[in-house]
Amino acid sequence: MIMKLVEDLLNKNLDIDEYVERTYERIEKIEKKIKAFITIRDKEEVKREVREKLKNPKGKLSGILIAIKDNISTKGIRTTCASRMLEDYVPPYDATVIEKLKQEGAVILGKTNMDEFAMGSTTETSYFGPTRNPWDLERTPGGSSGGSGAALAAGIVDIALGSDTGGSIRAPAAYNAVFGLKPSYGTVSRFGLVAYANSLEQIGPMAKNAEDLALLYSIISGDDPKDATTIHFEPQVPEKVELKDVKIAVLKDIVEASDKPVVSIFNSTLDKLSSEGAIIKEVNLGYAEYALPAYYIIAMSEASSNLARFDGVRYGYSKYSEGNWRETFAKNRGEGFGIEVKRRILLGSFILSAGYYEEFYIKALKIRRLIKDNVDNILKEFDLIASPTMPILPPKIGEVVEDPIKMYAMDLNTVIANLAGVPALSQPAGFYNNLPIGLQLMGRYLSDYYIMAISAKIEKVLNLYDLTAPIS
């Protein structure tokens, strides 16, 4: 638990040098095997900063090392988005969430690997190479925040930040047996996040237990004048919650589309919650078959607009400067972006072109509204919506990345929360042949603290928290 770790550091029950050395020894031992990081800061520099933070302790995270997904701007620390396009980019400013973490005494250990520009579900589209799952090195850690998930599972850090556009925090949380929250839309500033799809994405916390997840969320959340999409809200922290009489809706049409091993573990989890007094009932989401197409149409359309700025003139890879503008633009973007990013830019541009805008984009927005209305209606009757986080077990490296349809289908269970704007978290539900499987909980808008409080009860019932993969 982070609060205990801070206390031990402040009371000198844990030596600062020992804490930092232990972390870097772990990195030295396993980082080459898993490739969780793109950039790792100098050990002595980190040690000095930890000492400084503990000399003048001002916050809840005094001296604590944290891993940051590499699409979140960090002043003076390279931020690549796992792309050749931004291979050498060093931001001159911090994202709002980074400012908040620093104010609370956190120290950045490094920037984690991810799918290029957060476009992917396996952390295989990174220009710097794939991240491997610490539970099984032949498999992916999920994506796009796979580096953050792997760093947690491998025992390198206790807390991390990710971003979630259609499941990019929850997928790695599920596949790495850790906890991850996609916050209610607008509760965490996106200022300093390199945008993929503005109307869907949120920065969110990742941790090894529900308590640390809630602590990290409490620090990074809040309105921000630099981000017009943030809202002012009063945190609704429940004093006490119990599983008894909690009404949980199970999305039948989502569960039925999941693989048998996943459903088996999920049903076993539901049985345990039922024995604790939870009231569980199956419901149909409705429009489930349209959720993925609607999500990808919206996300790709927004991506094609957001990534237009990376032209090799104003931003990004600029190897070519001679010739006419069209030639240099095409060459720089052609070499600067990877295959998956180019695929999504092209599809997004096509969708937004004359004659197809109303046929695809407007229809996708209508489906989004229908799904949001259905989610809201279900949550008027129930306290929570539950489903497996991912429909399949962690795929092997190379198994889905070459097949876009297979990779996109992995997001079926998670995109619903992004389309509806509601909070959703993933926590460990169990293992099948030593492979982690996640439980997803969705709640009403702004019920983030409530679902994390329920998650804290569930982790104790399942006895699945503070897990570390047996990798050495």
UniProtKB/Swiss-Prot annotation:
A single GO BP: translation
Example GO molecular function: glutaminyl-tRNA synthase (glutamine-hydrolyzing) activity
Alphabetized InterPro entries for the sequence: Amidase (IPR000120), Amidase_CS (IPR020556), Amidase_dom (IPR023631), AS_sf (IPR036928), GatA (IPR004412)
UniProt KW keywords: ATP-binding, Ligase, Nucleotide-binding, Protein biosynthesis
Disulfide topology: none
Enzyme class: ligase
PANTHER family named among the record's database cross-references: GLUTAMYL-TRNA(GLN) AMIDOTRANSFERASE SUBUNIT A, MITOCHONDRIAL, TRANSAMIDASE
Subunit (UniProt): Heterotrimer of A, B and C subunits.
Similarity field: Belongs to the amidase family. GatA subfamily.
Function: Allows the formation of correctly charged Gln-tRNA(Gln) through the transamidation of misacylated Glu-tRNA(Gln) in organisms which lack glutaminyl-tRNA synthetase. The reaction takes place in the presence of glutamine and ATP through an activated gamma-phospho-Glu-tRNA(Gln).
Entry protein name: Glutamyl-tRNA(Gln) amidotransferase subunit A
Organism classification: Archaea, Thermoproteota, Thermoprotei, Sulfolobales, Sulfolobaceae
Gene name for this UniProt entry: gatA
